[in-house]
Amino acid sequence: MARVTVEDCLEHVDNRFELVMLSTKRARQLATGGKEPKLAWENDKPTVMALREIAAGVMDYSVIAEAEIVEDEPLFAAFEDESNEAV
């Protein structure tokens, strides 16, 4: 298992905040079994695997965005049928 450093990952993302957001989303994909790893899985935890993928340059927001499904729902759709009168 190769050691992953923040500096290795920052070569492929703009800042630490973006690194945290990207690695979190990717680790969740790997942990839930939704996506296959892009590198050989070396008995690492999903978070380490996500960081290894970012450090290798095979994972970025464009790959994550392809996998995300965003459904547009009205914020207050559940309350449309209720009246606004005070009780």
UniProtKB/Swiss-Prot annotation:
| EC number in record | 2.7.7.6
Q: What is this protein called?
A: DNA-directed RNA polymerase subunit omega
Q: Which class of enzymes does this protein belong to?
A: transferase
Gene3D superfamilies membership = 3.90.940.10
Known role? Promotes RNA polymerase assembly. Latches the N- and C-terminal regions of the beta' subunit thereby facilitating its interaction with the beta and alpha subunits.
The family assignment reads:
Belongs to the RNA polymerase subunit omega family.
Query: What does the subunit comment say?
Result: The RNAP catalytic core consists of 2 alpha, 1 beta, 1 beta' and 1 omega subunit. When a sigma factor is associated with the core the holoenzyme is formed, which can initiate transcription.
Q: Which Pfam families match?
A: RNA_pol_Rpb6
Q: Name one GO cellular component term.
A: DNA-directed RNA polymerase complex
Q: Which organism is it from?
A: Pseudomonas syringae pv. syringae (strain B728a)
